[in-house]
C-alpha cells in the first residue's frame, strides 16, 4: 500500500493506474462504517484510493478543528489490512495553497444546503464542496463512495457531479449499524453507557416510522408525531420528511422520501435517516 503525502506524488501515482479507480474520501478516525465503503470499492474497482484529510473549511466557528481525532497510524493499518491500493494524506497547505481571502469561492447549491444541517452549521456544506471538488480533481476516480447516513451531503455531491459535468459515478452506500442498530459514527465514542441506551431511541423511531409506512400510513404529520413520541427523552433538533430536493412533504412519496433526524444525547449530536 502506498502512502501519498503530496499532490505531486499522487498525480504521478494516478497516471500509472490504467484500470478502474474507486475513491473513498474520509476525515480519518475510521470505523466500520468507513470500512464498509472501502470494502465495496475494493469489490467494484481494480484500485482503491482512500483520502484521510481533516478539512478545515467545513468546521464552523463553534466547532473545534484542532480537537478532531487524528489516529493516522491506526487508520493506515486498517487500510493496509483491507487491501487499499493507496492512501492520500495531504497537509492543509497542499490542499489550500492560498489563504482564505485569495481563494476561489465555491458554494453548495442553496436549495440543498441551507436547511436541516445547513441551518445549524452555517457554511459547512460550502466547505464540503471545496474539498470534495479538489479531491475529485486530483484523484479523478471512476467511482466515489459516500454513506447514506450523511444524506444531505450525499445529495449535494450528486448535484455537484451532475452540475459540473464530472465523469464520476457516485455510489451511495447503505447506513452501517452496530448490533443495537445505532448508526455508526465517529461521534458515538463520546456517549457514555447511559447515553448510548438513550440514543437507541433514534433508530427505534425510524424503524417504527418505517413499519407504519409499510402498513399504509402516508400522512407525514402523523408519522412525525409517532417518531417524536419515541424521541421525547432526547433534545431533537429536527425530524423532517423531505423529497430528494429536500422540499418538505405532507405525504410519503415512494422512492422519493427522506426521513431525517438530528438529536442531541448529552453533549453529542447524532444524525440518522430513513430512505423510503
UniProtKB/Swiss-Prot annotation:
One of its GO terms (cellular component) is cytosol. Pathway: Cofactor biosynthesis; (R)-pantothenate biosynthesis; (R)-pantothenate from (R)-pantoate and beta-alanine: step 1/1. ATP binds at residues 27-34, 147-150, 176, 184-187. It catalyses: (R)-pantoate + beta-alanine + ATP = (R)-pantothenate + AMP + diphosphate + H(+). CDD domains: PanC (cd00560). It comes from the Bacteria. GO terms for biological process: pantothenate biosynthetic process. Belongs to the pantothenate synthetase family. Catalyzes the condensation of pantoate with beta-alanine in an ATP-dependent reaction via a pantoyl-adenylate intermediate. This is Pantothenate synthetase. It comes from Helicobacter pylori (strain P12).
Amino acid at each position: 500500500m502506498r502512502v501519498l503525502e503530496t499532490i505531486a506524488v499522487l498525480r504521478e501515482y494516478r497516471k500509472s493506474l490504467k484500470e478502474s479507480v474507486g475513491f473513498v474520501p474520509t476525515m480519518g478516525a475510521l470505523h466500520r462504517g468507513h470500512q464498509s465503503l472501502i470494502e465495496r470499492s475494493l469489490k467494484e474497482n481494480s484500485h482503491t484510493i482512500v483520502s484521510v484529510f481533516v478539512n478545515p473549511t467545513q468546521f464552523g466557528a463553534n466547532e473545534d478543528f484542532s480537537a478532531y481525532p487524528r489516529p493516522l497510524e491506526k487508520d493506515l493499518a486498517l487500510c493496509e489490512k483491507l487491501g487499499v491500493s493507496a492512501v492520500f494524506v495531504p497537509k492543509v497547505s497542499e490542499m489550500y495553497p492560498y489563504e482564505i481571502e485569495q481563494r476561489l469561492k465555491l458554494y453548495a447549491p442553496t436549495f440543498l444546503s441551507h436547511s436541516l444541517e445547513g441551518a445549524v452549521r452555517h457554511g459547512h456544506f460550502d466547505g464540503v464542496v471545496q474539498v470534495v471538488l479538489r479531491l475529485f480533481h486530483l484523484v479523478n476516480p471512476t467511482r466515489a463512495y459516500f454513506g447514506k447516513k450523511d444524506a444531505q451531503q450525499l445529495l449535494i455531491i450528486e448535484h455537484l457531479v451532475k452540475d459540473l459535468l464530472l465523469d464520476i459515478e457516485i455510489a451511495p452506500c447503505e447506513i452501517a449499524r452496530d448490533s443495537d442498530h445505532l448508526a455508526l459514527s465517529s461521534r458515538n465514542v463520546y456517549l457514555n453507557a447511559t447515553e448510548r441506551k438513550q440514543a437507541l431511541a433514534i433508530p427505534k423511531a425510524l424503524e417504527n416510522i418505517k413499519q407504519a409506512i409499510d402498513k399504509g400510513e402516508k400522512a407525514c404529520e402523523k408519522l412525525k408525531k409517532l417518531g417524536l413520541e419515541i424521541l421525547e427523552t432526547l433534545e431533537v433538533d429536527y425530524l423532517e420528511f423531505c423529497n430528494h430536493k429536500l422540499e418538505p412533504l405532507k405525504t410519503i412519496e415512494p422512492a422519493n422520501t427522506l426521513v431525517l433526524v438530528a438529536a442531541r444525547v448529552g453533549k453529542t449530536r447524532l444524525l440518522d435517516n430513513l430512505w423510503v
